[in-house]
Regions:
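A short, structure-level motif marking secondary-structure boundaries and short turns
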Residues: 7, 29, 100-102
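Short conserved micro-motifs on helix faces and helix-strand junctions that flank
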Residues: 15, 102-103
């Protein structure tokens, strides 16, 4: 059962020493930039509740028993805006459509590949999915290779090879610039859609003052694929603000990429695939629509 106990860090008391990271080696302890310098916070969406971060006996920790995390409302964006989203661009497809989804374990990267594969199936297209989880666990790099095929009888390997990606869907910026992802980019073919919110890496646990600026990583993607081929959005920040949970960021990214013409799938088939997945259906459909809205009318958010 889920323990009815949560830990929080008081920003007013935290001195930013990073001992909580040292004690726990947990990536759910995240940096919080404030006018008084870098503090620490706990990503409640990712916390696995082993409570090791409190072992440093830091006075900034607050333990809450029996309470839940207050979620932001899902009605902050007017419904008429979501209903007025124009039809997405539809890519011209004359070959198998290759997608590489890059992210971190525990955030639903593999699920995204499965949902998009199901959406293709609902349109009577072929779909092949190949997940690369390797030895990664939660917060390790995960890649899902997806090929959408007009004629299922011509289906071949799902692996997205050198320069074969039509879409690099970067749910995590660090995972997106890894060699295994960059090798799939062809400047004349690949559209890159990436979450620009930088997630702290394991190095942050031992180097609490490390530079967490993602601009150089984003520039690296632009250098490989061309500035005009890269679209970035602060998906994690927007998802947290509008849905109350960072886990909505990846579904948000699907909507964002679809609206920009990165996926040869219909809105209806993707939403139906989310329904068939059967997990937090309304939450994920809402996040998907927010992603579409961010691509078509960013000022609305």
């Amino acid at each position: 059962p889920d323990p009815q106990k949560r830990l929080f860090i008081s920003q007013e008391v935290c001195e930013g020493c990073g001992d909580c990271s040292t004690q726990s080696n947990c990536l759910s302890v995240v940096p919080k930039e404030t006018p008084l310098g870098r503090k620490r916070g706990i990503d409640q969406s990712a916390c696995n509740k082993d409570y090791s971060c409190v072992e440093g006996f830091c006075p900034s920790f607050v333990t809450v028993h029996g309470g839940g995390v207050k979620r932001a409302g899902m009605t902050e964006v007017p419904m008429e805006l979501l209903q007025a989203i124009p039809a997405p661009k539809f890519p011209s497809v004359d070959h198998d459509w290759s997608v590489l989804i890059a992210g971190v374990g525990g955030t639903g990267v593999v699920t995204i590949g499965a949902v998009l594969g199901m959406a293709a199936h609902l349109e009577n297209k072929g779909a092949a999915v190949f997940d690369m989880t390797g030895v990664s666990q939660k917060n390790g790099a995960v890649y899902s290779h997806l090929k959408i095929i007009e004629d299922p009888d011509t289906m071949s390997s799902a692996d997205v090879g050198l320069g074969e990606a039509d879409l690099l869907l970067g749910c995590d910026l660090v995972a997106s610039v890894a060699p295994v992802a960059v090798r799939t980019i062809d400047p004349n073919r690949t559209r890159v859609v990436v979450n620009e919110t930088l997630t702290a890496t394991p190095q942050f646990q031992s180097s609490p003052n490390m530079n967490l600026e993602g601009g150089l990583l984003l520039k690296g993607l632009q250098d490989h694929s061309g500035v005009n081929q890269v679209s970035s959005v602060a998906a994690t920040r927007i998802a947290l603000s509008l849905t109350g949970d960072t886990i909505g960021a990846n579904t948000f990214m699907i909507g964002y990429a679809l609206q920009l013409g990165g996926l040869p799938l219909s809105v209806e088939s993707v939403e139906r695939a989310i329904e068939l997945n059967g997990v937090a259906v309304q939450f994920n459909i809402h996040a998907f629509r927010l992603g579409r809205l961010a691509a078509s009318n960013p000022d609305a958010l």
